């Protein structure tokens, strides 16, 4: 491998001369002789690839490909549904890119890395502060898996075998939880959300002694703010647990779920210091009441004193199957989201409580401003009348098709939202019962000028005769 003939090819595993020498020592003339006993129709075929490029040529090709992208930063984006475009201060990537944090894996002697453990401890503290809960873990993979793990945690705590999910829960959370439940032979019931929020009488009819937990999103997928306290009272009256999914930014303004009766709170860290990045990576968070700490999945960092009386951080509970017997483990949740959790911590620390409140207020005020502007357009109305945070649904006139309208907006530089009646992916629809409805999200990144432009362009698009003719064709097909 260190032949004088390949000194300028240090990354090649073997040069042509070295391969020839090895074949000669083996006693065959060519590589094909080594695999001659393998039928030709099952052998790997030679890939039809072009000649290799120099670094300069490759850089040019990749730049040309990247130029074809249409990132949200070059458009007016009103997409939401779980991933939100928010401003990330430069200090966030600066800190998480430090070599002390940006490592390949957790140290196998974690107490050596006191800085990393302190960061995890501070992350847990921040999560407890915004959720109003007693204890939080070191992070989860993302929001959907945190939701599923919370459901499994509730099953272990109650010994019951049924989960109720309200209709306002994000479809991705619901599908991941359903996957977990089906594998574990746990029943899963879906509550409708015909008016955008959970119906109390429908919930009461679903509750019985077999229900382990009820999962509610706050604000929910449609942006509506659920009445958590009333729902929690009903859930607890039947001996079940209340699992709440929350966008952390909304908690800068809304009452903490823990103060409204939540037993377990989960969510996604994407909106706090993490970029959209084509949908990932992100991190999930999970917090619960102190009584449930032994069933909390993942890792927990704690603070104690060492044998010299100095403050020290340590991993206090690690009920993962990597650390204890599988039969006693709470989950197999890994550690690879720690860097994204750190980004959330840095983001929240930079904002502080007042900054988070101001950020949430701006998002809410601008969302309400846009909703009012859009509803002034003939034929456009809010789909639900429920109070909302920074996300809301509108219903377009029956004479047009939502997918066509959104495509027209995109052609004009506006990502107008999510078509709630469209097939989100091969596994199911976002909300097929909501015909011609669009889900719109607003953050601090959407200026008032952008909001005015959205309303202006949507009005133009809806008044277009060409659009209406196209919509008729779409509806006829």
Language-model segment annotations:
Residues 18-24, 125, 426-477:
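PLP-dependent enzyme catalytic core of the Aspartate aminotransferase-like
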Residues 272-378, 382-385:
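Active-site C-terminal subdomain of aminotransferase-like
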Residues 1-23:
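Charged, compositionally biased N-terminal leader segments and the immediate start
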Residues 1-2, 98-110, 126-133, 158-159, ...:
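Gly-rich Lys/Arg/Thr-decorated short loops/hinges at beta-loop-alpha junctions or inter-strand turns
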Residues 108-112, 116, 128-148:
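Short loop-beta-helix segment that forms the pyridoxal 5′-phosphate
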Residues 14, 36-122:
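N-terminal entrance/gating region of PLP-dependent enzymes' catalytic architecture
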Residues 354-454:
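Conserved C-terminal alpha-helix-loop-beta "cap" of PLP-dependent enzymes
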Residues 145-314, 379, 394, 403-409, ...:
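Conserved PLP-enzyme active-site core in the AAT-like
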């Amino acid at each position: 491998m260190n032949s004088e003939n390949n000194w300028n090819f240090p990354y090649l595993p073997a040069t042509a001369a070295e391969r020839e020498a090895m074949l000669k020592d083996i006693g065959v003339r060519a590589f094909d002789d080594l695999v001659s006993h393998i039928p030709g129709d099952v052998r790997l075929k030679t890939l039809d690839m072009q000649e290799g490029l120099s670094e300069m040529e490759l850089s040019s090709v990749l730049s040309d490909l990247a130029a074809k992208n249409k990132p949200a930063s070059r458009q007016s984006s009103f997409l939401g549904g779980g991933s939100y475009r928010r401003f990330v201060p430069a200090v966030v990537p600066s800190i998480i890119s430090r070599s002390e944090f940006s490592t390949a894996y957790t140290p196998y002697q974690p107490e050596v890395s006191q800085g990393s453990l302190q960061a995890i401890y501070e992350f847990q503290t921040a999560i407890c502060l915004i959720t109003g809960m007693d204890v939080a873990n070191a992070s989860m993979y993302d929001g959907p898996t945190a939701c599923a793990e919370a459901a499994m945690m509730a099953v272990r705590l109650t010994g019951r075998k049924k989960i109720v999910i309200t209709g306002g829960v994000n479809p991705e959370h619901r599908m991941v939880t359903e996957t977990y439940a089906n594998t574990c032979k746990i029943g899963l019931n879906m509550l409708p959300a015909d008016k955008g929020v959970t119906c109390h009488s429908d919930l009461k009819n679903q509750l019985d002694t077999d229900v382990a937990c009820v999962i509610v999103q706050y604000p929910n997928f449609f942006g509506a703010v659920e009445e958590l306290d009333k729902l929690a009272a009903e859930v607890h009256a039947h001996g079940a647990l209340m699992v709440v999914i929350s966008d952390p930014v909304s908690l800068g303004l809304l009452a903490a779920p823990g103060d409204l009766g939540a037993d377990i709170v989960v969510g996604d860290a994407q909106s706090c210091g993490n970029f959209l990045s084509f949908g990932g990576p992100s991190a999930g968070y999970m917090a619960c009441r102190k009584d449930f700490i032994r069933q909390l999945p993942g890792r927990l960092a704690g603070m104690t004193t060492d044998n010299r009386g100095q403050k020290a951080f340590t991993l206090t509970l690690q009920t993962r199957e990597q650390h204890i017997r599988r039969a006693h483990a709470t989950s197999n949740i890994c550690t690879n989201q720690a860097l994204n959790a750190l980004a959330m911590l840095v983001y929240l620390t930079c904002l502080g409580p007042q900054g988070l409140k101001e950020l949430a207020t701006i998002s809410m005020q601008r969302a309400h401003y846009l909703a009012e502007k859009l509803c002034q357009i003939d034929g456009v109305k809010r789909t639900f009348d429920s109070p909302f945070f920074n996300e809301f649904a509108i219903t377009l006139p029956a004479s047009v098709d939502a997918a066509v309208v959104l495509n027209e907006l995109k052609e004009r530089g506006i990502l107008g939202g999510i078509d709630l009646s469209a097939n989100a992916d091969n596994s199911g629809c976002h909300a097929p019962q909501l015909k011609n409805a669009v889900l719109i999200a607003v953050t601090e990144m959407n200026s008032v000028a952008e909001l005015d432009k959205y309303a202006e362009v949507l009005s133009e698009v809806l008044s277009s005769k060409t659009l209406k003719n196209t919509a008729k064709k779409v509806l006829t097909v």
